[in-house]
């Protein structure tokens, strides 16, 4: 992977946006996020490696999602990671980093998910527990896929672009229970064929896409693809060409291509 470059576009000024900064009990610190939209299905956007919640807007992914946001089909919640203290801090204490990452997972599942559900229920006049689409590019795709496969009771869609799906990327050869349960290629490979989660996965839509050009690492997607196939887990795993690089212009194209399928009722 490489640091994503800034793409300058005209800023979308008509979209409803809301900014939040609140204390997280799971992390013991204040966390920031933004909400884009006025209704529709909830989408959780997780930024690229070491990215911030404002990257969804600053890198103009808002422009790409605008047709679905402004038409009330989706409401996007763009959050912060703590990658610099966890996956990216490869010289740091691995046991500490694995616990901190697990705390971040609980920040999402125990704090952000209820917040998102309450907001979209109020926006849409819904009741109940709407499922959430997890979306990310680069390391954000790794986090999104981990959330989707760990908690199919909370997430009912996945769009993972140019991701890595083994915790070895951030933790090397270190392994404990926390690293294991946050490494999809490890826990899915050992999942029993009759595990109830497999039925849940197969009622949902998961898209896992990678290019094969500069800075991409398609071997991670191929490894996950083999495991999903072996377990009978349905997912649309797509390999784009050798011209498709690990960069925003290609992610824009992939979002435009895949989102209609994710949102289509079938």
Predicted regions and their residues:
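Non-catalytic cap/lid and distal C-terminal segments of serine-dependent acyl enzymes
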Residues: 14-266
């Amino acid at each position: 992977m490489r640091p994503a470059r800034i793409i300058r576009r005209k800023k979308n000024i008509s979209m409803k946006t809301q900014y939040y900064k609140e204390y997280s009990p799971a992390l013991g610190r204040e966390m920031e996020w933004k909400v884009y939209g006025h209704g529709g299905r909830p989408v959780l956007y997780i930024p690229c490696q070491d990215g911030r919640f404002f990257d969804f807007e600053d890198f103009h992914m808002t422009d790409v999602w605008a047709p679905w946001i402004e038409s009330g089909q989706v409401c996007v919640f763009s959050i912060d990671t703590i990658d610099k203290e966890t996956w990216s801090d490869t010289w740091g204490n691995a046991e500490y980093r694995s616990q901190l990452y697990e705390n971040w997972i609980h920040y999402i599942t125990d704090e952000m998910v209820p917040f998102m559900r309450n907001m979209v229920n109020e926006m849409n006049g819904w009741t109940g527990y709407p499922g959430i689409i997890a979306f990310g590019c680069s390391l954000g795709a790794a986090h999104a896929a981990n959330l989707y496969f760990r908690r199919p009771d909370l997430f009912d869609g996945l769009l993972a672009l140019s991701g890595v799906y083994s915790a070895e990327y951030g933790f090397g050869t270190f392994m404990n229970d926390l690293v294991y349960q946050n490494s999809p290629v490890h826990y899915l490979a050992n999942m029993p064929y009759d595990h109830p989660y497999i039925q849940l996965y197969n009622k949902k839509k998961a898209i896992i896409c990678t290019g094969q050009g500069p800075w991409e690492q398609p071997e991670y997607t191929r490894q996950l693809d083999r495991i999903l196939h072996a377990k009978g887990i349905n997912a649309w795993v797509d390999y784009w060409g050798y011209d498709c690089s690990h960069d925003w212009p290609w992610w824009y194209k992939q979002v435009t291509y895949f989102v209609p399928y994710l949102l289509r009722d079938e």
